[in-house]
Amino acid sequence: MMKDKEHVIVGISGGVDSAVAACILIENGYRVTGLHIKVLDHSDDSLHLEKSPLIISDRKEFRFPVFSLNLSGSFRRDVIDYFLQDYLSGRTPNPCMVCNKLIKWKGLLKGADLLQATLVATGHYARIDCGREKCRLLKGTDSQKDQSYFLWMLSSEELSKTLLPVGNLTKQEVRELARRFGVRAAEKKESQEICFVPDNDYREVVKSSRPGLAEKLTGGEIIDTEGKVIGHHAGYPFYTIGQRKGLGISSPEPLYVNRLDPEKNRIRVGGKAMLQCRKLIAGQMNWTGISPPETSTRAAARIRYRDTGEACTIVPVEKERFEVIFDKPKQSVTPGQAVVFYRDDEVIGGGIIVEAISE
């Protein structure tokens, strides 16, 4: 990995992973500059960098300059507004992967341009393997921390300019390195929340964004698989596919949300078997490992972060849309989430789930 004094911009989040990534690069002979991207500053984007007082390590040899770049305006438009609109459209968004593409890498590459750096780096648990013709995105070595699912939107060109120094390490190894490097965040706990969703309660974020929305949608119908009204709900945006709790319905068998109907403010529920899907339709595709398939092709598909994957056939059905046919049914396929395709450890592409098909 060593390239003596090659200049790298490292995305600094304040956590242990990005700090260790920076220190690894320093130890390997890179010239490192940190970039902290501000996204919740309640102001518009800034086109200039500001010196940040952040100090990552207590050891002088692992100290480096850190700048901040304000992308709050872009974050509000490209991430928060998308997040809200998806819920209002009956979908379940994944803002972190959109943020990676449109905010983090946009900001890092902008910082690299302003500071005349050749590469960018982050603390993501994934790997990049660059050959003569292309760069491949691979799973991280630590299967419990692998974040390749969140990076499927990145282009081959973006991958070619990126280093992921902790991708071949386990979390325990990163903690151990952090202590050796004197990283101040060595013992910092990981946040499991979306950064703009307090207490991980997306419903309150949706409600506060649209005054009067909750009152307007309260009382919508809950129907069963035969169309019979069996209850009422608090508003379709506040439910997700596979949800069981909070329905307020008495039933001899557990009931789960299996469809949202924004036009009628209606949700449909049924037994667990109704969550099984053999197919899905995906759009907004990005292919990094292969060219867009013109005929059916095989892969393994993950439909959520912790999904272990399922063998499938990918079939082009129309421009920019593909049908994914699973070898075995998948549970709780959720429109708005990503389906990411793998061959062994390599991410070959992905897309956004448009429709789940139960037949």
UniProtKB/Swiss-Prot annotation:
Job of this protein:
Catalyzes the 2-thiolation of uridine at the wobble position (U34) of tRNA, leading to the formation of s(2)U34.
Per the record, its GO cellular-component terms are: cytoplasm
Report what the protein is called: tRNA-specific 2-thiouridylase MnmA
Q: Which InterPro entries match?
A: MnmA-like (IPR004506), MnmA-like_C (IPR046885), MnmA-like_central (IPR046884), MnmA-like_central_sf (IPR023382), Rossmann-like_a/b/a_fold (IPR014729)
Give the GO biological process terms.
tRNA wobble position uridine thiolation
Organism per entry: Chlorobium phaeobacteroides (strain BS1)
Q: Name one GO molecular function term.
A: tRNA binding
The record's Pfam families line, in alphabetical order, gives: tRNA_Me_trans, tRNA_Me_trans_C, tRNA_Me_trans_M
Alphabetically list the UniProt keywords. ATP-binding, Cytoplasm, Disulfide bond, Nucleotide-binding, RNA-binding, Transferase, tRNA processing, tRNA-binding
Family statement: Belongs to the MnmA/TRMU family.
User: Where do the catalytic residues lie?
Assistant: 99, 195
Protein origin, superkingdom: Bacteria
Give disulfide pairs as residue numbers. 99-195
E.C. number(s) listed in UniProt: 2.8.1.13
User: Where on this chain does ATP bind?
Assistant: 11-18, 37, 123
